[in-house]
């Protein structure tokens, strides 16, 4: 019996398409539904953009085995970083701070403070980071982001462990 396997190029381009779809849905929720993203949502969005661009470059490049592992390792690190932000936001939604205040938006923080000072402020989150404005099947946007980034991390691990390149 002949086994069916997707090429590395097709898998990376498929990941790009999935991430582009997720980003498109996020933009739909922002512009059509009117949900404004909090700083943590924007950080997760950046992770998806970076994963999508890495997957696109990998798909167009069509690397061999070592290149596939290198691209997959970068994607894994990006998924873990984005997943960490999504996990923190999920925690804030489950256990909101007692006195939540809306903090400054991401642009203001990055434009007004050095990066070393802005990053801790972003990860502290704003009051609106703990608010659940939208849910599907009982999961918030942060929960869905965590699920998707976990699946991306599993994908990357499978690509690293894959026996064949190309």
From Swiss-Prot:
Molecular-function GO term, any one: protein-disulfide reductase activity
Paired cysteines (S-S): 38-41, 102-129
Keywords: Cell inner membrane, Cell membrane, Chaperone, Disulfide bond, Electron transport, Membrane, Oxidoreductase, Redox-active center, Transmembrane, Transmembrane helix, Transport
Segments in the Cytoplasmic topological domain: 1-11, 64-70, 163-166
Residue intervals on the Periplasmic side: 29-46, 88-143
Name recorded for this polypeptide: Disulfide bond formation protein B
Subcellular location: Cell inner membrane
């Amino acid at each position: 019996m002949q086994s069916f396997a997707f090429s590395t190029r097709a898998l990376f381009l498929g990941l790009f398409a999935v991430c582009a779809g997720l980003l498109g849905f996020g933009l739909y929720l922002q512009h059509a539904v009117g949900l404004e993203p909090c700083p943590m949502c924007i950080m997760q969005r950046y992770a998806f953009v970076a994963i999508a661009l890495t997957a696109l470059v990998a798909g167009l490049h069509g690397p061999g085995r070592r290149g596939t592992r290198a691209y997959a390792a970068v994607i894994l690190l990006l998924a873990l970083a984005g997943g960490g932000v999504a996990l923190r936001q999920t925690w804030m939604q489950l256990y909101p701070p007692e006195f939540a205040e809306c903090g400054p938006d991401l642009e203001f923080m990055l434009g007004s403070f050095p990066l070393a000072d802005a990053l801790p402020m972003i990860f502290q989150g704003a009051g609106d980071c703990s608010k659940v404005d939208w849910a599907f099947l009982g999961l918030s946007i942060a929960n869905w982001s965590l699920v998707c980034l976990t699946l991306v991390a599993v994908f990357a691990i499978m690509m690293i462990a894959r026996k064949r390149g190309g």
